[in-house]
Design a protein with these regions (language model features):
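Membrane-interfacial, low-structure loops and terminal tails that flank and connect transmembrane helices
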Residues: 1-2
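A structural signal for multi-pass alpha-helical bundles of membrane permease subunits
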Residues: 7-297
Length: 297
């Protein structure tokens, strides 16, 4: 066998290509972790940071605005995750039933395109559609004799609209993964089930879903790891009229950190969010083992 040095010499081109990626990983993923230390300091730019222990966390937990943002984050993120997961599975099952390959490919492409759009573009599109003055939706409402609604400035409507927009943008990613998983389902079992008189719904419940359960659990856990990352979609759709409904941990951290210059407090809030994310992933992993007998992590 080749020695380590011989292997490195043989595959040096691959190592050279890997170096920029490794440096980016160090620069943008690992070095910023040292910023966690600011959570335990009273930090102001251009001045020495003073160690304050857990005071930032005590201040944070005593603020009503923090808990409001925290519970908003849980409600919005978990609801979005459930809708996105179920919607992706259902959509994948429906697309898998299409017999015309060209139509199936076109449908997959159309569904997947929004995933590549930035949230700024998505927000601009839906702001125009939902505009109370000349938006398409309000145009239909007023044409039918109703009053125009300022959807994005109405606390009653903001969350349903947010879920609709977020799912429209993200559902394609999960759908493509589940369609790929469905292509590996054993069709002989389905043929045997048809001979036994099983309906299409029964085949989906007892054959198809169990066959792709591993993929479903894996995608769910991966999404759970980033479930609290709501800054981009919330920030571009948020306004002062719906702050009580839409304020989440990341927007809260941004406002107190950047606008309020309370960097220690905002870092403490960010660290708290990271700990909750880790706990959610750990709980999801344990539930996965209990329900399916498999651990993702």
């Amino acid at each position: 066998g080749l020695t380590t040095r011989q292997k490195m010499k043989k595959y040096r081109a691959f190592y050279i290509m890997f170096i920029p990626l490794f440096l980016c990983l160090i620069l943008f993923s690992y070095l910023p972790m040292f910023g966690i230390l600011y959570a335990f300091t009273d930090y102001t730019p251009f001045k020495p940071a003073q160690f304050v222990g857990l005071q930032n966390f005590q201040k944070l937990f005593s603020q009503a605005g923090f808990w409001k943002a925290f519970f908003n984050t849980l409600q919005i993120s978990i609801t979005k995750l459930v809708i996105d997961t179920l919607g992706s599975i259902v959509l994948a099952l429906l697309l898998d039933e299409l017999h015309f390959k060209w139509f199936k490919k076109i449908s997959q492409t159309i569904i997947y395109i929004p995933h590549f759009m930035s949230w700024v573009v998505v927000a601009s599109i839906f702001t125009m559609f939902l505009s109370p003055k000349n938006g398409l939706i309000n145009g239909v409402i007023t044409a039918l004799g109703g009053d125009s609604i300022y959807f994005l400035a109405n606390e009653k409507w903001w969350r349903p609209i947010f879920y609709m927009i977020a799912v429209w943008k993200d559902i394609g990613w999960g759908t493509i993964i589940y369609i790929a998983a469905l292509s590996g389902v054993d069709m002989e079992q389905h043929e045997a089930a048809v001979l036994d008189g099983a309906t299409r719904f029964q085949r989906v419940i007892y054959l198809t879903l169990p066959a792709i359960s591993g993929t479903i659990v894996t995608v769910f856990i991966l999404n759970l790891a980033k479930v609290l990352n709501l800054f981009d979609p919330v920030w571009v759709l948020q306004n002062s009229m719906v702050i009580n409904t839409s304020d989440v941990l990341e927007t809260y951290v941004y406002l107190i950190g950047i606008s309020g210059s309370k960097y220690g407090l905002s870092t403490a809030a960010g660290l708290f969010k990271s700990v909750i994310s880790i706990l959610l992933v750990a709980i999801g992993n344990k539930l996965s083992k209990k329900l399916t007998g498999e651990e993702v992590l």
